């Protein structure tokens, strides 16, 4: 038996602060509860006046009944507030089912992408804004919230909107159920719920100090620029450009971060230099991370829900939410302990005296605001060069696998293979290592000059050398280049003929089913491409097209792909499966994971319990499906998070 659920809720806390913070707020309540058992009609309970039926409550506690919702993580979180001891293991998420098929993340967009007869009620946004969000009081209406009795007709519409959401969710589930991922993915999803519910403790003393010091720094920089420029608002790009054009004697095209950095590297007047330095201070967007932490921290002193399961299209990797752990600034300071204490003292002058750039210190300390509970420490372990290891394993590029087996430096080995000379880090031909590193990061998925330039952001490699480096890298890695071609050929053949194709690399299977092109990974998980077809690319050559999210425009429509891109999807997906499997093993060994970032796991453990060495051993254990893949990890133990 299945029970499909959708809830409408109210909270004074904005949902953008995170679902856990939203539900944690004392004003949170479930307004409407729509449900349907199996094929029964959808019922809606108005929880502002009626309790849930006993049959529904019993089902919430019954482990034999599967509970489903479109964004089940939210429904589970809401119901936990009312029924903390109910069953939260036999839940399935229809949104994850859609994401597994590389469909959009929202109910409305999935129904449109699948071209279902059932559609989400378009009145929803207006009704949510009216009943589920606080209103601004006015002189004529001092109320801070709209209640059902304030607008009975709208409330009736809201009930129907809630009902329709379950109708659409059930239609989506019915369409996609035969494409369910392997059972292990449900275990990964449940583990993801545990990690998000557990959350990470925040050092609020550090966060508050960072925000206070930043306010002082911004005020000082603003006043300084006002005096130097005479501008009323020196943070206005238009006003500042006019002033700079007059002082420099030529027109600046743009005022991006890179433009400011390039100007500061030149011989410019001292007042211009100071104004540009102030501009950098005023443009320090990293401070928003501290504000996000302050807004998201819950009553238990922790931030929850920072990871989105299957958040990355096609690869299935996790995506960041709330604080966006995936793009936290790096730290380079040698003594983080001292820097943290000075920041907590809120002494901006001392920060300036010790480090020369208080704003940069605040930026570097963002990671350290995430701390372990008293009596605990973080064990942080990160897979080493996992994508390079995975692509070498799949492509059977033996010399690369030998490098990893011997514990070598892949950047040095790559440069040595390209230039046919020994290369040692800080040793013989050490200057070539950087070229090897850039090539490794840029060329693994068919990238060319553009990819090299993007990876070599500082322009350390002369442009005239790039074509030669690209050619040398490809000649040194013929099995990887063959992987691109084989993936491209297999996908096109399947789309053209409808017949399945296996390629030698990883014994990966390409096949077509129910309107999707599927790529079956070694783990058994599948990558999906909706409505695949063949078309012509901008060069006039045959290309693979499918319906998907345009990552630039963020719209659903035609997307083009090719062999190198398919290999990137495959490699990143295999790396994701390695991480997921390792986290499940760690959890079964008793380790409490509080976060993970890219290929790194963050564990909170009591002091004296567990060890980094054991964590690394568990992470690098092989699975039956990745035999021969040489994994390695490194890490550290510390009372706060940082980049080692």
Positions of PLM-derived features:
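A short acidic-Thr-Gly-centered motif at the start of a beta-strand
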Residues: 1, 58-61, 361-377, 584-588
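Short, conserved charged micro-motifs
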Residues: 608-614
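Conserved "right-hand" nucleotidyltransferase catalytic core of DNA-directed polymerases
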Residues: 1-9, 13, 32-34, 113, ...
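Conserved pre-motif C helix in the palm subdomain of viral-like polymerases
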Residues: 164-170, 564-584
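Active-site palm subdomain of RNA-directed nucleic acid polymerases
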Residues: 176-188, 578-598
């Amino acid at each position: 038996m299945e029970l499909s659920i959708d809830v409408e809720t109210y909270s004074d806390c904005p949902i953008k602060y995170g679902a856990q913070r939203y539900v944690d707020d004392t004003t949170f309540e479930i307004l409407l509860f729509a449900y349907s058992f199996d094929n029964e009609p959808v019922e809606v309970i108005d929880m502002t006046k009626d309790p849930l039926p006993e049959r529904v409550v019993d089902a919430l506690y019954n482990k034999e009944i599967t509970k489903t919702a479109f964004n089940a993580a939210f429904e589970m979180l809401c119901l936990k507030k009312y029924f903390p001891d109910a069953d939260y293991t036999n839940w399935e998420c229809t949104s994850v089912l859609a994401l597994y098929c590389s469909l959009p993340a929202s109910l409305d967009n999935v129904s449109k992408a699948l071209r279902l007869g059932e559609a989400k009620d378009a009145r929803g946004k207006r009704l949510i804004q009216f009943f589920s969000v606080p209103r601004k009081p006015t002189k004529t209406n001092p109320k801070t919230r709209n209640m059902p009795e304030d607008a009975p007709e709208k409330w009736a519409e809201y009930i129907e909107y809630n009902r329709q959401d379950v109708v659409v969710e059930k239609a989506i589930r019915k369409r996609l159920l035969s494409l369910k991922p392997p059972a292990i993915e449900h275990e990964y999803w449940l583990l993801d719920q545990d990690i998000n519910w557990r959350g990470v403790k925040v050092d609020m003393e550090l966060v508050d100090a960072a925000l206070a010091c930043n306010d002082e720094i911004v005020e000082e920089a603003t006043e300084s620029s006002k005096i130097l420029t005479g501008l009323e608002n020196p943070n206005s790009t238009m006003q500042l450009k006019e002033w700079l054009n007059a002082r420099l004697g030529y027109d600046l095209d743009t005022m991006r971060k890179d433009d400011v950095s390039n100007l500061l590297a030149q011989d410019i007047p001292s007042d211009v230099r100071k104004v540009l330095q102030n501009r950098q201070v005023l443009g320090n967007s990293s401070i928003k991370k501290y504000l996000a932490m302050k807004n998201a921290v819950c009553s238990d002193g922790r931030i929850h829900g920072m990871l989105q399961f299957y958040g990355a299209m096609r690869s299935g990797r996790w995506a960041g939410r709330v604080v966006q752990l995936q793009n936290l600034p790096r730290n380079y300071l040698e003594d983080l302990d001292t820097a943290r204490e000075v920041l907590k003292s809120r002494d901006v002058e001392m920060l300036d005296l010790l480090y020369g750039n208080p704003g940069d210190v605040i930026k570097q300390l963002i990671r350290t605001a995430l701390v372990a509970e008293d009596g605990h420490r973080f064990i942080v372990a990160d897979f080493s060069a996992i994508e390079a290891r995975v692509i070498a394993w799949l492509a059977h590029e033996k010399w690369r696998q030998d490098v990893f087996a011997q514990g070598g430096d892949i950047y040095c080995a790559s440069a040595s293979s390209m230039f046919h000379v020994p290369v040692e880090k800080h040793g013989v031909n050490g200057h070539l290592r950087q070229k090897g590193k850039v090539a490794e990061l840029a060329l693994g998925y068919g990238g060319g000059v553009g990819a090299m330039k993007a990876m070599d952001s500082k322009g350390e490699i002369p442009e005239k050398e790039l074509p030669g480096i690209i050619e040398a890298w490809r000649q040194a890695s013929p099995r990887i280049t063959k992987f691109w071609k084989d993936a491209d050929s297999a996908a096109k053949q399947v789309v053209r003929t409808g017949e399945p194709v296996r390629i030698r690399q990883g014994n990966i299977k390409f096949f077509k089913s129910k309107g999707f092109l599927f790529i079956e990974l070694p783990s058994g998980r599948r990558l999906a491409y909706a409505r695949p077809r063949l078309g012509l690319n901008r060069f006039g050559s045959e290309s693979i097209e499918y319906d998907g999210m345009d990552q630039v425009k963020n719209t659903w429509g035609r997307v083009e792909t090719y062999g190198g891109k398919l290999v990137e999807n495959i490699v990143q997906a295999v790396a994701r499966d390695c991480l997921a499997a390792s986290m499940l093993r760690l959890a079964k060994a008793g380790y409490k994971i509080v976060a993970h970032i890219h290929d790194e796991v963050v564990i909170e453990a009591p002091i004296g319990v567990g060890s980094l060495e054991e964590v690394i051993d568990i992470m690098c254990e092989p699975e039956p499906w990745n035999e021969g893949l040489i994994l390695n990890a490194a890490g550290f133990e510390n009372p706060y998070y940082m980049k080692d």
